[in-house]
């Protein structure tokens, strides 16, 4: 019985699911906006918000080491968390990200969503980056 278990399995084993969430959170921290499936976005949101809270409250060596251990030793993402995002969200108590339903994916009709950080860079606002079949990035206005 699944009493008290509210997490989505995302059709993956535990290690693969955690690795997927870590990789998605690194991408979201670096780019501040990503396009993914709706269940992944809903599962990713509390995961990333905990990282931002750690960066805000524990801007010490211990906090840096906590974030490095939980983000696959991605120094670029940890530096951005501690230097840029922690100062940006210093006055905000929560709700650092938003999920916007996007469209359905053409191949399997999966519901897609845009997850982005609130109060992100003004220059990047309104642009959604998605990959085309050739691997290049296409900018579309949302």
Curated annotation (Swiss-Prot):
Record keywords: Ribonucleoprotein, Ribosomal protein
* A Pfam entry, by short name: Ribosomal_L17
Q: Which residues cross the membrane?
A: none
Q: Which SUPFAM superfamilies match?
A: Prokaryotic ribosomal protein L17
Keyword flag Ribosomal protein: yes
Protein family membership: Belongs to the bacterial ribosomal protein bL17 family.
The name this protein goes by in its record: Large ribosomal subunit protein bL17
Species whose genome carries this gene: Wolbachia sp. subsp. Drosophila simulans (strain wRi)
Q: What is the phylogenetic placement of the source species in the record?
A: Bacteria, Pseudomonadati, Pseudomonadota, Alphaproteobacteria, Rickettsiales
- Name of the gene this protein is made from: rplQ
């Amino acid at each position: 019985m699944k009493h008290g278990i509210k997490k989505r399995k995302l059709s993956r084993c535990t290690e693969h699911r955690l690795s997927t969430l870590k990789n998605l959170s690194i991408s979201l921290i670096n780019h501040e906006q990503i396009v993914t499936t709706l269940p992944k976005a809903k599962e990713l949101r509390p995961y990333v918000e905990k990282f931002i809270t750690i960066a805000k409250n524990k801007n010490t060596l211990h906090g840096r080491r906590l974030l490095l251990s939980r983000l696959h030793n991605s120094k670029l993402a940890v530096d951005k968390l501690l230097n840029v995002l922690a100062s940006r969200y210093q006055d905000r108590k929560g709700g650092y990200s938003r999920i916007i339903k996007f469209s359905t994916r053409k191949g399997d009709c999966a519901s897609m969503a845009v997850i982005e950080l609130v109060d992100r860079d003004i220059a990047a606002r309104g642009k959604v980056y998605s990959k085309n079949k050739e691997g290049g990035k296409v900018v579309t206005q949302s």
